[in-house]
Amino acid sequence: MLGLNSANKSPRIPDGFVLLRSELISVRKINRLLSRCNQDTHQPRKLELALKNSDFYLTLLQKTSENLVGFVRVTSDKGLNANLWDLIAEPGDQQEKYMSIVVFKAIEIIRRELPGCSISVAAPLISLNPLKANGFLLDPNGIKTMGFRR
């Protein structure tokens, strides 16, 4: 859940990188990054369908190599809730920075285009610091979430 007092400054995108919104991206690149982050990968067809049915997704790419270094996908019911999925960033010393870039931009878009929606995220532990830095609260007021996996 996102706190009300989260007016952070936009993290600077490093030189040589570009942040794109809903630009065609290979599901293989997303799965490769998920794997490098020790996250579950998705069946290519299901991931393609998820991208198609998302409200938007953000990709952070190195310009010269077109390597995917950050990703998040957003869905919403367009009324009450917006959800961040598959929040990942290239492992290494810049991982938190890359994550902060995609999280900040996702929040900015949600606030502008889906005002009033509460924002939730299912994310790995490594993302806790960037999420907190962008105003997320861990289990506010004792609220716990659950997920179902088949």
Residue ranges and their predicted role:
Residues H42-T64, L68-I88:
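A conserved beta-strand-loop-helix scaffold within acyl/acetyltransferase catalytic domains
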Residues L87-E96:
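A short, internal acetyl-CoA/4′-phosphopantetheine-binding micro-motif in the GNAT/acyltransferase core
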Residues Q95-I109:
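Conserved acetyl-CoA-binding loop-helix of GNAT-fold acetyltransferases
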Residues E108-R111, F136:
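Beta-rich extracellular carbohydrate-active architectures
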Residues I110-P124:
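Conserved GNAT acetyl-CoA-binding A-motif
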Residues V121-F136:
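Low-complexity, intrinsically disordered Gly/Pro/Thr-rich segments
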Residues K132-R150:
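Active-site/acyl-donor-binding loops of N-acyltransferases
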